[in-house]
Amino acid sequence: MSGFKQHTGLVVPLDTANIDTDAIIPKQFLQKVNRTGFGKHLFHDWRFLDDAGQQPNPEFVMNAPRYQGASILLARENFGCGSSREHAPWALADYGIQVMIAPSFADIFYGNSINNQMIPVRLTDIEVDEIFQFVEANEGAEVAVDLEAMLVSANGKQYSFEIDEFRRHCLLNGLDNIGLTLQHADKISEYEAKIPNFLK
């Protein structure tokens, strides 16, 4: 995986709190275990008026022409609550979302997002309010996220955020659990060479 350092992108404002993983990717689309192909089902019950996903809901913000191509999702508190399905960050990533900004995230969803090289940025309610106002008032508004400096830049302002150093290291270097293990491949091979044959 390639690492994440900075990203500037169009923001889609989803002004709803407590969005759960069943809303993000409904259960009927969870048959696959690979990470691709879920983007078309993202927020299915909100984006579409029919079960087949052929009739877009014109009232849903992500269907608005001004937000097409958005790579940053702005939301309210407790985003990603509910079941622990990893398909939720898979669907967001497959749709094109690279960064999520909210006052808080459900713990398991937060970890799953980082494991999938997505950046969940926690800001205060007031800071999120300011970004909502900026995005909704300015068509084409973009926000910049700098993981190295741990800063969000919007409308001439900068907002600092925190992420623990280990997770930040993984994101900056594009490391998932396998990548972390492979960083120690030499030591693993050295240890394996010392194991008696009868234990192999």
Curated annotation (Swiss-Prot):
<keyword id="KW-0100">Branched-chain amino acid biosynthesis</keyword>
<dbReference type="InterPro" id="IPR015928">
    <property type="entry name" value="Aconitase/3IPM_dehydase_swvl"/>
</dbReference>
<keyword id="KW-0028">Amino-acid biosynthesis</keyword>
<dbReference type="InterPro" id="IPR000573">
    <property type="entry name" value="AconitaseA/IPMdHydase_ssu_swvl"/>
</dbReference>
<protein>
    <recommendedName>
        <fullName>3-isopropylmalate dehydratase small subunit</fullName>
        <ecNumber>4.2.1.33</ecNumber>
    </recommendedName>
</protein>
<keyword id="KW-0432">Leucine biosynthesis</keyword>
<dbReference type="GO" id="GO:0009316">
    <property type="term" value="C:3-isopropylmalate dehydratase complex"/>
</dbReference>
<dbReference type="Pfam" id="PF00694">
    <property type="entry name" value="Aconitase_C"/>
</dbReference>
<dbReference type="InterPro" id="IPR004431">
    <property type="entry name" value="3-IsopropMal_deHydase_ssu"/>
</dbReference>
<keyword id="KW-0456">Lyase</keyword>
<comment type="function">
    <text>Catalyzes the isomerization between 2-isopropylmalate and 3-isopropylmalate, via the formation of 2-isopropylmaleate.</text>
</comment>
<comment type="similarity">
    <text>Belongs to the LeuD family. LeuD type 1 subfamily.</text>
</comment>
<dbReference type="GO" id="GO:0009098">
    <property type="term" value="P:L-leucine biosynthetic process"/>
</dbReference>
<dbReference type="GO" id="GO:0003861">
    <property type="term" value="F:3-isopropylmalate dehydratase activity"/>
</dbReference>
<comment type="pathway">
    <text>Amino-acid biosynthesis; L-leucine biosynthesis; L-leucine from 3-methyl-2-oxobutanoate: step 2/4.</text>
</comment>
<dbReference type="InterPro" id="IPR033940">
    <property type="entry name" value="IPMI_Swivel"/>
</dbReference>
<dbReference type="InterPro" id="IPR050075">
    <property type="entry name" value="LeuD"/>
</dbReference>
<comment type="subunit">
    <text>Heterodimer of LeuC and LeuD.</text>
</comment>
